[in-house]
């Protein structure tokens, strides 16, 4: 119910956004081979996942919204199972971490359902690999069955995309947390950890070698390496600044934006629904905590130790989450579209917040804090979905106006459009919609129409504002 209130209220009024338009146009208009070419230069294995899902679902936004909703929810379910295993006897605390993960406010692009459903699937694979490993630790008779399943899920995560790539190394932290109560000497603990980690470490090393020597045609190269050679001190200083900025962003700023109210024309009607969402989440989350089996009473020292382990694991996860972006010189942001990078931090951040709240000795205060954070974050996600819904309506109105006022747009036409009216579309996004509308029977790799933002393309893909000049623009598929 919390997932539905955060993401499902506008599910049938949302559409395709940003990279979704060109990817779906390439797949459904130009065919599966064109989609293979599109992913050939970056994430080819992830492209296979797109091939599979697009064979199942048509180019209907509502289907993809439901699809993404289910994967987002399933990810939170797996997080609950992981934390419940690591934090034994604390089901309420595990629920709190799962809910924080579900509605993490740093990432607000859930409405781009086609695109991010495939992110959620890969994240689900990573989380399932951790859960399978924990199951293997608890089931000696089925150790290898669970381990093989965990290795498979881990490989799918590592081979498909880079967002959760370095986060794979948090596995050693998960093992240490799971073993914390076992009576082992230091040597036995190290050997036990290495034994459990070694199969997954082998898969990680193989994937690194694959990216280095087999498929090294990455769109974004690791510029940090060359920068370290040319200016090591300055590069390390900037890297440290980027890391600190990112940590503040995902741990503090992401949550503070929950308190920012929207500046919209129909403010009252929007806020009425917003307050209803928050109130409903408060009731549902409170009921969930109260009806769930209460956390076991433990000594203060045991509570502090267990919660501290969870916080430590979260800190490790957050630190590892940023390296796929820091290595290529990207810094996460809360602005669109760069807040997509915060998705990889959601697991670690939810562990940190859940662990810190778990340090509080008073159960009622813990529940109040968790419910407050979850309800405000769910309300923020609803407001984000509404922004996307409004942008979809403006985009549809734009092309309705075009087909009404310029029904006979000739092939090989360049359309120039001022920026500012649309928040969640780039000009190459709109180019695909333009071709879908004006050239519905064109299934070749020759694109008949292109839409440019002059401020973005002038002096680049668009040499000058003149008629009859050749324009070369590549969609990778056409």
Features from the language model and the residues they span:
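Polytopic membrane enzymes that build or remodel cell-surface glycoconjugates and lipids
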Residues: 1-448, 455-456, 461-478
